[in-house]
Amino acid sequence: LVKLLQYLDRQEPQQRWGDYLKDGAPNWGRIALAGQSQGAGMAAFIAQRHEVARVILFSSPWDFTLTDGNVRQLARWVSAPGKTPPERWYGGYHERENMAGLIAEAYAALRIPPDHIRVFRDDLPPAQQQTGKRNPFHGQGVRNPIYDQDRAFFLGRSP
C-alpha cells in the first residue's frame, strides 16, 4: 500500500496521494476500507488493528475454526477489542447466502451498530436464477442494482 501511494503521488501529485501517508506508513485515519467476501474479511482485520476512517463489509467476515463437535466458531480476532470505533463500521449480507448466520454473529462480535447493518432479502435477478452456483446470494449486496441505496448509505455518512 505504501509503495502504491508513493507511486500515485509521483504520477499524480495534484491528487495529493501522499496525504494518505504519514511518516512513511499508511495514514489509516484518512483511509476508508471496503470489501466483499475475503476482501471484507481483510478490511475488518485491518480495521481491528488500525483506526480507519470507515470500514464497509459485504458478506464477511466469517473466519472460523471448527470445535471438537464440528461446530463453526468465529475466529478470535473477530471479537477482540478493535481500534476503529463501532460508529465507523457498516456491513451488509443477504439472508439466504450460505454463511448468513455466521456473518450476523461476526457483525455483532465486531459491535457494528444495528442501524449500520443491511440484511438484503430480495430474490435473485431473473438472469441469475438458473446459474447453478452453490452460493448464488453471496455477492448480491455489491452487484444487484436493487441495493444501490444501501450502498449509498454505507458511503454517505462521515464518522
Annotate each PLM feature.
Residues 1-25:
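Alpha/beta-hydrolase active-site loop
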Residues 45-54:
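Conserved hydrolase catalytic core segment
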Residues 53-145:
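The feature captures the conserved acid-bearing segment of alpha/beta-hydrolase catalytic domains
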Residues 23, 27-31, 58-62:
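Surface-exposed cleft-lining segments at the edges of enzyme active sites
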Residues 112-114, 148-158:
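Long, compositionally biased intrinsically disordered regions
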Residues 32-39, 43:
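Gly/Ala-rich beta-loop-alpha elbow adjacent to hydrolase catalytic centers
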Residues 22-25, 77-83, 158-159:
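Surface-exposed acidic, glycine-flexible loop patches that form ligand/cofactor-binding
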Residues 42-46, 105-106:
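A short acidic, amphipathic alpha-helical/loop segment
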